[in-house]
Each structure stands twice: as structure tokens, then as C-alpha cells.
């Protein structure tokens, strides 16, 4: 039974280029970027977006420890060239979980797991400037993203 569930997870997440990487104390869903993904955009909750003139950093990989039942500090790691502003260090470090904190990691439904993983990757492909460890000093253009509101 465990074997079938594991195969279902692997088949589902691999459709979007996620893989399982097993280590001593963790089982990580891993997304590898080749070439590394250049992070050139940051946003604030207010809707203001900074488009940087050059990459702030490049993501080589995202690791999500799926042995954690909920996302906490230490669940998401980034492998980067340079330091991602939402990560505690450059190279390889803990990503700030931000709004992902306490979200369930659902292994019983591979589709839900894949949805969460894709949400995580699209989040860290940008910079959440409201909760960054530092603000990039690279020149940027500002644009306003409009938020639709129901009337």
C-alpha cells in the first residue's frame, strides 16, 4: 500500500518537474532549474511591483521536506546563486515560510501536494518584499498591480 501511494506521488509531481530526494532525516520534493531561474521581480502586499534591471539571484533548486505534516521554518530550502531576499543565507538556506506557515502538506492526495508545490515554486520565483531579510539595491522600475475587488 505504501509503495502504491509513493508511486502515485512520484508520477503526479513529476508532471511538473518535481522529484523526490531522500536523505538521512528528510524526504524532499525537489524542483531543479536548468538553467538557474533568474529572480528579477519583487512585490509588496500593497500591489506595488519592483522589476529589477538585473537578476537579484538565481534559483538552482527548491526543496520541500514532505515529512513535515505542516510547513514551518526549515520545511522549505532554496539552492541559489547569490542570496534570495526571502532566504536566510545564500547558496543553500532556509526560506522564510511567510503565508505558507502552518499549511498542511497532504501526502494522501498527490494532486493537492502538487498544487502546493507549484504555489511554493511560483512564490519564490519572485521576492516578497514585505517579509524579506534584505531589500535589493539593484536599480528597478515600479509598477502597480491592480487588485480586483467585488462590488
Regions from the PLM with identified roles:
Residues 113, 118-133:
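C-terminal folded domains that constitute the principal catalytic or ligand-binding module
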Amino acid at each position: 500500500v505504501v509503495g502504491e501511494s509513493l508511486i502515485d506521488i512520484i508520477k503526479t509531481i513529476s508532471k511538473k518537474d518535481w522529484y523526490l530526494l531522500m536523505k538521512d532525516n528528510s524526504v524532499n520534493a525537489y524542483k531543479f532549474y536548468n538553467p538557474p531561474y533568474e529572480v528579477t521581480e519583487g512585490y509588496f502586499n500593497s500591489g506595488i511591483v519592483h522589476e529589477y534591471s538585473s537578476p537579484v539571484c538565481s534559483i538552482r533548486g527548491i526543496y520541500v521536506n514532505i515529512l513535515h505534516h505542516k510547513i514551518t521554518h526549515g520545511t522549505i530550502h532554496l539552492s541559489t546563486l547569490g542570496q534570495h531576499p526571502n532566504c536566510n543565507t545564500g547558496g543553500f538556506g532556509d526560506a522564510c515560510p511567510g503565508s505558507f506557515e502552518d499549511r498542511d502538506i497532504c501526502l494522501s492526495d498527490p494532486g493537492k501536494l502538487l498544487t502546493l508545490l507549484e504555489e511554493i515554486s511560483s512564490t519564490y520565483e519572485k521576492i516578497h518584499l514585505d517579509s524579506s531579510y534584505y531589500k535589493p539595491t539593484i536599480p528597478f522600475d515600479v509598477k502597480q498591480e491592480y487588485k480586483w475587488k467585488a462590488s
